């Protein structure tokens, strides 16, 4: 069932991307099926809807979508889209946002600065076709803002944390493979996409694959050799000690430079402490080695965020602390109550949340059909 759902969603993501391309829009699939490629078995991830970033800005994209379906609702970062073959689609003109106006301004400038690379980063989605997905550096920042948004609004889901674990793993795989494209340094360094027929067996290590078969054409091989084991070629080509040492040195230098860039952006965006909280969870819950953490773990903040995950769940659906009911008024009161709880840890976002919500009300009136 899970396998079939992923195959179906893959097809839909490819078709929706191609449909927008024919209409003159470049696109990039956010999260979702792009994240599935990072899993040991891409068909094992529980699929959701399709989040597609469409180039063009809010006015142009909203106008285009409403020329097809006039009554679709728009919010600051996306507009609803008619379901495509039964699949829910959200069309983004902004990948994500932050509630603090100052930090959000910087985030939107960052997205504008790096968008060209995202729209041109093509990968194979299994054997079904090509889509554009974000680069690994972009994902480290974008998906952290997405998780933060869930924390500030209603609640973080476990799948978002699992996704981020594999985002970090994918980051190091990409830089490891780019440092030594001819030799993959560890058995776990190869991301592959098994055929749907093989994924149901549970054996996700059986297929023979070379390193990084799913990377973009520009960033590495997109096809695999059926005769390549992909992780242990020492017997075939002799002693690789010197080459391995050189590759490790190059990998460390490249990944360190990339981490420095990511850390700089996280500080600029006011996400440093939240990143530390997520790294604490990655280490304590998911067992990620300290050498793979992108910032130093923050135990105090990590325990707080982990408690929020366990108490609330995705969108706060399981939060027993919701004492105001499910009405619109109750929802707004619950948001204020949540802001009070969060202000001690994330004051800029929590204090700006009521202001942003008020501003967003008028923004939606402006774009209301």
Protein language model regions, located:
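Conserved NTP-donor binding/palm subdomain of two-metal-ion nucleotidyltransferases/polymerases, i.e.
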Residues: 1-48, 53-176, 253-369
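Intrinsic disorder/low-complexity segments
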Residues: 124, 173-256
């Amino acid at each position: 069932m899970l396998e079939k759902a992923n195959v179906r969603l893959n097809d839909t993501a490819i078709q929706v991307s191609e449909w927008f391309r024919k209409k003159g829009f470049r696109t990039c699939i956010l999260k979702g099926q792009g994240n599935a490629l990072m899993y040991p078995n891409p068909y094992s991830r529980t699929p959701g809807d399709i989040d597609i970033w469409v180039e063009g800005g809010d006015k142009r994209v909203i106008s285009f979508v409403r020329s097809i379906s006039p009554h679709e609702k728009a919010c600051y970062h996306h507009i609803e889209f008619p379901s495509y073959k039964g699949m829910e689609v959200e069309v983004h003109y902004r990948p994500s946002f932050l509630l603090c106006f100052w930090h959000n301004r910087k985030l939107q400038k960052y997205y504008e600065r790096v968008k060209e690379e995202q729209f041109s980063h093509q990968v194979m989605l299994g054997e079904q076709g090509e889509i554009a997905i974000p680069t690994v550096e972009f994902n480290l920042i974008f998906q952290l803002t997405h998780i933060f948004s869930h924390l500030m609004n209603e609640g973080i889901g476990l799948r978002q944390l699992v996704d981020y674990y594999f985002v970090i793993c994918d980051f190091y795989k990409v830089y490891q493979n780019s440092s030594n494209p001819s030799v993959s340094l560890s058995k776990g360094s190869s991301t592959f996409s098994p055929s749907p027929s093989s994924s149901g067996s549970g054996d996700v290590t059986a297929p023979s694959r070379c390193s990084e078969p799913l990377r973009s054409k520009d960033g590495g091989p997109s096809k695999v050799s059926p005769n390549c084991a992909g992780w242990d070629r020492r017997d075939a080509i002799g002693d690789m000690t010197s080459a391995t040492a050189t590759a490790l040195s190059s990998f460390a230098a490249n990944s360190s430079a990339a981490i420095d860039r990511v850390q700089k952006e996280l500080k600029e965006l006011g996400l440093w402490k939240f990143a530390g909280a997520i790294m604490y969870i990655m280490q304590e819950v998911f067992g990620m080695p300290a050498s793979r953490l992108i910032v130093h773990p923050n135990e105090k903040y990590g325990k707080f965020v982990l408690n929020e995950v366990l108490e609330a769940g995705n969108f706060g659906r399981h939060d027993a602390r919701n004492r105001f009911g499910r009405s619109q008024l109750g929802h707004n009161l619950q948001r204020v109550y949540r802001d009070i709880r969060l202000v001690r840890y994330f004051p800029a976002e929590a204090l700006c949340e009521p202001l942003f919500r008020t501003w967003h009300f008028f923004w939606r009136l402006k774009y209301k059909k």
